[in-house]
């Protein structure tokens, strides 16, 4: 790469540093971490979303864990030994100031390296800010020809290119870095922006140069799934491609990379495991209550695509692991796949009729009509809570086609809710229960939607009326991410409403029964041990009762239990279904019963690096099997969370409708097509 190419590359990487620094400033401003220095180093107001805050919080805590572990270990060494922290690509990070203010640099010093322009700008910022100067003590500012931009007794800032290792070594020597002292090398979202050969050379150079060292990196991984593809495309659009992911896509490959480069020990965790295993329950609860939050899928997927790694060498730093091993494995991988279910696109939707939304609900009104409402999606060229309805219907040539519909008349308007449920009452009528407008605004009341369709059953000329459902007074259902399932008691039809969350309660365990004929809430006895509360679970009807599977429980714990609300003479009885082999905990999936089997479709899990396909559970034997989805004939990526689905048993097909999400800071993605899964291989008796 020539000088101009290097300069352009430095500029694009610097833009990612600027964005990251602003996020860290917002993180501190909203109480996730204590960092009064972030605002001093990065001027200007900024407000990031709760999802961005959580993502940067777990990043900050993972790096903090490694830095504190290094300082604890080296503090036990003889008093003449000074520990060294070498931060590579440090940008506007406030690490030095936080450590100095906490009194953790009495026997340690910090060196930072970044592009010369970045380092000089930071040095100038420190020079002109009294609060920062108070931490550094007496200092010198280097001249424009020197690689040393800032120097104090325990802090150096250097301007250098990490790809030019000989010059880097000379600059560090000149700045007083002692290669024989215990050294922590920190590269926080840095190496992946280098060409793989340059990054590998840097890793090997560090192993050769520092006999007692710890190398910590925080980076992206898992580029091959749907979320990973959106992540890759985002950085490509920024002209900052993630070079290392093709050769080192998973943690195992990254560990091997360091071991082959001369590091003697290496361990790594994805951020879900770090968050669940190495942060206390009290700290997690503090963070989870700081702001209203309802983007669990994207939070867990973000954490599944980043890792923290610590490689060590030398007698001093290889004896104690940075990440203490756990007695129980965090990994809960699904069973080996029993086969594949082929997928194909079944709609030829035009842009104006496509179903690009998530968090919606769908109801199969008849074998030829699927009605969808609500959610967050694309409408009139922008992303918003969707006000238009969508109908998938059979055209005359037996192909599905989509149509968007607006509200008819002035009697009522759709309120834009999402994470509600929708239940078929007749071929033209559905009941909408619950939902939210925002994490602090539950939807108001139940709605009845009436679909008026043309006589030829084609999509043209259809309209919808919205009316308040005539439920009894005082029966407001202020929850979302719940389930509504048709059950029967004493030959009467009821809707069983279970779980969910509300503004006040992060998880609910409520059981409510709505008598369909009278639209009245009634009390029906339920025996057996009540299951733990949950939301974002699946529910489907079976043998007059309801099957409940998975979900997010208290403290945002993913659940794997499958429960049956069984009809008995006195009401209902909770039973737990024993499943072998046990299934991977998940949520945000859908479920159907087909040929005596419970199908769990898609969703999000954090205990496996694979992507959920379809889990098949025999309801007679409890035996489970896993099927992957063959997406070779489907435009990629396909995100199977926040979606809805409709079972067509006569055709042995399952339609996947909508889905997607706000993929952290990488952009929002909506599945562009309705997709059919072929279930013919799941015949009865198999």
Curated annotation (Swiss-Prot):
<feature type="binding site">
    <location>
        <position position="114"/>
    </location>
    <ligand>
        <name>S-adenosyl-L-methionine</name>
    </ligand>
</feature>
<dbReference type="InterPro" id="IPR029063">
    <property type="entry name" value="SAM-dependent_MTases_sf"/>
</dbReference>
<feature type="binding site">
    <location>
        <position position="188"/>
    </location>
    <ligand>
        <name>S-adenosyl-L-methionine</name>
    </ligand>
</feature>
<keyword id="KW-0819">tRNA processing</keyword>
<dbReference type="Pfam" id="PF04072">
    <property type="entry name" value="LCM"/>
</dbReference>
<feature type="binding site">
    <location>
        <begin position="161"/>
        <end position="162"/>
    </location>
    <ligand>
        <name>S-adenosyl-L-methionine</name>
    </ligand>
</feature>
<keyword id="KW-0949">S-adenosyl-L-methionine</keyword>
<feature type="compositionally biased region" description="Polar residues">
    <location>
        <begin position="12"/>
        <end position="23"/>
    </location>
</feature>
<dbReference type="InterPro" id="IPR007213">
    <property type="entry name" value="Ppm1/Ppm2/Tcmp"/>
</dbReference>
<feature type="binding site">
    <location>
        <position position="59"/>
    </location>
    <ligand>
        <name>S-adenosyl-L-methionine</name>
    </ligand>
</feature>
<dbReference type="Pfam" id="PF24681">
    <property type="entry name" value="Kelch_KLHDC2_KLHL20_DRC7"/>
</dbReference>
<comment type="pathway">
    <text>tRNA modification; wybutosine-tRNA(Phe) biosynthesis.</text>
</comment>
<dbReference type="InterPro" id="IPR015915">
    <property type="entry name" value="Kelch-typ_b-propeller"/>
</dbReference>
<comment type="similarity">
    <text>Belongs to the methyltransferase superfamily. LCMT family.</text>
</comment>
<comment type="function">
    <text>Probable S-adenosyl-L-methionine-dependent methyltransferase that acts as a component of the wybutosine biosynthesis pathway. Wybutosine is a hyper modified guanosine with a tricyclic base found at the 3'-position adjacent to the anticodon of eukaryotic phenylalanine tRNA. May methylate the carboxyl group of leucine residues to form alpha-leucine ester residues.</text>
</comment>
<feature type="binding site">
    <location>
        <position position="89"/>
    </location>
    <ligand>
        <name>S-adenosyl-L-methionine</name>
    </ligand>
</feature>
<dbReference type="GO" id="GO:0003880">
    <property type="term" value="F:protein C-terminal carboxyl O-methyltransferase activity"/>
</dbReference>
<protein>
    <recommendedName>
        <fullName>tRNA wybutosine-synthesizing protein 4</fullName>
        <ecNumber>2.1.1.290</ecNumber>
        <ecNumber>2.3.1.231</ecNumber>
    </recommendedName>
</protein>
<feature type="region of interest" description="Disordered">
    <location>
        <begin position="1"/>
        <end position="23"/>
    </location>
</feature>
<dbReference type="GO" id="GO:0008033">
    <property type="term" value="P:tRNA processing"/>
</dbReference>
<keyword id="KW-0489">Methyltransferase</keyword>
<dbReference type="GO" id="GO:0032259">
    <property type="term" value="P:methylation"/>
</dbReference>
<keyword id="KW-0808">Transferase</keyword>
<comment type="subunit">
    <text>Interacts with RNF144B/IBRDC2.</text>
</comment>
């Amino acid at each position: 790469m020539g000088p101009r190419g290097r300069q352009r590359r430095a500029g694009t990487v610097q833009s990612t540093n600027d964005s990251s620094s602003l996020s860290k400033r917002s993180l501190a401003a909203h109480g996730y971490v204590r960092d009064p220095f972030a605002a001093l180093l990065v001027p200007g107001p900024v407000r990031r979303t709760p999802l961005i805050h959580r993502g940067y919080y777990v990043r900050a805590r993972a790096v903090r864990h490694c830095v504190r572990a290094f300082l604890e270990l080296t503090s036990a060494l003889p008093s003449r030994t000074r520990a060294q922290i070498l931060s590579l690509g440090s940008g506007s990070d406030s690490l030095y100031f936080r450590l100095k203010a906490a009194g953790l640099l009495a026997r340690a010093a910090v060196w930072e390296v970044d592009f010369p322009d970045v380092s000089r700008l930071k040095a100038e910022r420190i020079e002109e800010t009294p609060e920062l100067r108070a931490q550094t003590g007496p200092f010198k500012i280097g001249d424009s020809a020197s690689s040393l931009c800032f120097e104090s007794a325990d802090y150096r800032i250097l301007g250098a290119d990490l790809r030019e290792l000989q010059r880097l070594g000379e600059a560090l020597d000149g700045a007083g870095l002692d290669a024989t002292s215990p050294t922590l090398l920190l590269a926080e979202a840095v190496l992946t922006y280098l060409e793989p050969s340059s990054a590998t050379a840097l890793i090997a150079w560090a192993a050769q140069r520092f006999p007692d060292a710890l190398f910590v990196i925080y980076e992206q991984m898992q580029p091959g799934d749907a979320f990973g593809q959106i992540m890759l495309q985002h950085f490509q659009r920024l002209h900052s491609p993630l070079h290392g992911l093709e050769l080192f896509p998973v943690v195992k490959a990254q560990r091997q990379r360091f071991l082959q480069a001369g590091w003697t020990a290496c361990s790594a965790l994805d951020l879900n495991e770090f968050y669940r295993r190495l942060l206390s329950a009290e700290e997690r609860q503090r963070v989870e209550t700081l702001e209203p939050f309802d983007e669990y899928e994207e939070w867990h997927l973000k954490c599944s695509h980043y890792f923290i790694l610590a490689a060590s060498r030398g007698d001093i730093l290889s004896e104690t692991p940075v990440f203490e091993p756990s007695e129980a494995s965090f990994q809960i991988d699904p069973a080996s796949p029993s086969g594949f279910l082929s997928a194909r696109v079944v709609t030829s939707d035009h842009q104006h009729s496509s179903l690009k939304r998530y968090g919606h609900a769908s109801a199969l009104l008849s074998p030829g009509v699927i009605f969808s409402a609500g959610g967050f999606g694309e409408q009139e060229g922008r992303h918003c809570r969707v006000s238009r309805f969508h109908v998938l219907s059979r055209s005359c040539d037996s192909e599905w086609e989509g149509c968007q519909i607006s509200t008819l008349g002035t009697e009522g308007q759709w309120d834009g809710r999402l994470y509600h449920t929708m239940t078929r009452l007749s071929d033209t009528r559905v009941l909408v229960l619950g939902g939210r407008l925002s994490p602090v605004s539950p939807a108001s009341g139940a709605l009845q939607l009436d679909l008026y369709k043309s006589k030829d059953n084609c999509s043209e000329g259809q309209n919808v009326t919205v009316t308040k459902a005539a439920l009894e007074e005082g029966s407001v259902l202020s929850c979302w991410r719940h389930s509504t399932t048709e059950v029967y008691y004493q030959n009467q039809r009821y809707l069983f409403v279970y779980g969910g969350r509300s503004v006040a309660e992060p998880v609910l365990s409520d059981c409510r029964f709505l008598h369909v004929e009278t639209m009245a809430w009634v009390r029906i006895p339920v025996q057996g041990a009540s299951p733990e509360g949950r939301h974002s679970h699946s529910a489907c009807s079976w043998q007059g009762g309801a099957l409940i599977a998975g979900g997010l429980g208290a403290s945002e714990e993913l659940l794997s239990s499958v429960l049956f609300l069984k009809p008995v003479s006195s009401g209902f009885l909770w039973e737990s279904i024993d499943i072998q082999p046990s299934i991977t905990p998940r949520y945000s999936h859908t479920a159907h019963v087909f040929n005596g089997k419970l199908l769990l479709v898609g969703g999000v899990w954090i205990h496996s690096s694979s992507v959920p396909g379809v889990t098949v559970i025999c309801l007679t034997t409890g035996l489970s099997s896993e099927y992957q989805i063959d997406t070779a004939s489907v435009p990629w990526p396909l995100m199977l969370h926040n979606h809805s689905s409709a079972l067509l048993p006569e055709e042995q097909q399952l339609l996947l409708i909508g889905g997607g999400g706000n993929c952290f800071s990488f952009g929002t993605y909506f599945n562009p097509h309705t997709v059919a899964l072929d279930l013919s291989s799941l015949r009865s008796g198999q």
